[in-house]
């Protein structure tokens, strides 16, 4: 959706990635322009039920309010789950109360502490661990092991891996 440019340009949108696992969409970060890129990609909005915000910088979450509002305009009824570091709900609650009073669905914020590793989300399709920030970059978007090697944020659950 977006390559991660903190300053959106005509060629590069702010951070937002979508992972399609078993026809379920999972969004990682929701920068400005995310809903436009979803439309361009012809991905069904109704299949997106979980959004994961890596950290609380504007270029990672400024697209949320517009996306939530658009879901309401489209008559969405399925719950939307937003997983983020602590503080996002406090930031968005007043804006949702003001701009999205008549939503036809519920938005649930699942916040976590950023200091310790933990399991953020797990179902039969995907496991999403929260890891400590990489000491080299001080970012949560670059997870590193104790030996300095980096690993992926989202990995398929064992049950979702096809067996031969």
Predicted region positions:
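Binuclear metal-dependent hydrolase catalytic cores
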Residues: 1-164
């Amino acid at each position: 959706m977006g390559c991660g440019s903190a300053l959106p340009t005509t060629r590069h949108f702010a951070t937002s990635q979508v992972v399609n696992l078993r026809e379920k969409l999972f969004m990682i970060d929701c920068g400005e322009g995310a809903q436009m890129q979803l439309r361009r990609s012809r991905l069904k909005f109704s299949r997106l039920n979980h959004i994961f915000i890596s950290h609380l910088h504007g270029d990672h979450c400024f697209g949320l309010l517009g996306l939530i509002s658009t879901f309401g305009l489209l008559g969405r009824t399925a719950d939307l789950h937003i997983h983020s570091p602590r503080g996002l709900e406090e930031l968005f609650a007043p804006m949702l109360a003001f701009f999205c009073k008549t939503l036809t669905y519920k938005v649930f914020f699942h916040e976590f502490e950023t200091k310790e590793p933990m399991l953020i989300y797990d179902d039969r399709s995907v496991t999403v661990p929260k890891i400590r920030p990489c000491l080299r970059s001080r970012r949560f978007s670059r997870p590193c092991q104790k030996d300095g090697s980096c690993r992926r944020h989202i990995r398929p659950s064992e049950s979702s891996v096809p067996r031969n």
